[in-house]
Amino acid sequence: SIAFSRAVFSEFLATLLFVFFGLGSALNWPSTVPIPTVLQISMAFGLAIGTLVQTLGHISGAHINPAVTVACLVGCHVSFLRATFYVAAQLLGAVAGAALLHKLTPEDIRG
């Protein structure tokens, strides 16, 4: 159905954005004199997850993590089919987010 497809795409997009912004916050850009601290990086991850849950949570539940999806499957909160598609979308979203960050980041910044 359309709602199921939207939910799967929502998981893909949320995971892509979470990985992109989270990992992007840990890069050492030349304009930042000191390297990002653990607190700054964790704040970026926290703000990213909070924002994504608020914006996409009503569509799919915003699991954004295969471990959360598997836990929901074990707890009988989602069907096996939904969990399978969610995990696949999350894995693809994570790879796509990292690949996008890799392509958009200058080579000397990547480390």
From Swiss-Prot:
Subcellular location: Apical cell membrane; Basolateral cell membrane; Cell membrane; Cytoplasmic vesicle membrane
Lineage: Eukaryota, Metazoa, Chordata, Craniata, Vertebrata
Membrane topology, from the record: Multi-pass membrane protein
The protein's name: Aquaporin-2
Gene: AQP2
InterPro entries recorded: Aquaporin-like, Aquaporin_transptr, MIP, MIP_CS
Family: Belongs to the MIP/aquaporin (TC 1.A.8) family.
Intramembrane segments: 62-71
Record's function text: Forms a water-specific channel that provides the plasma membranes of renal collecting duct with high permeability to water, thereby permitting water to move in the direction of an osmotic gradient. Plays an essential role in renal water homeostasis. Could also be permeable to glycerol.
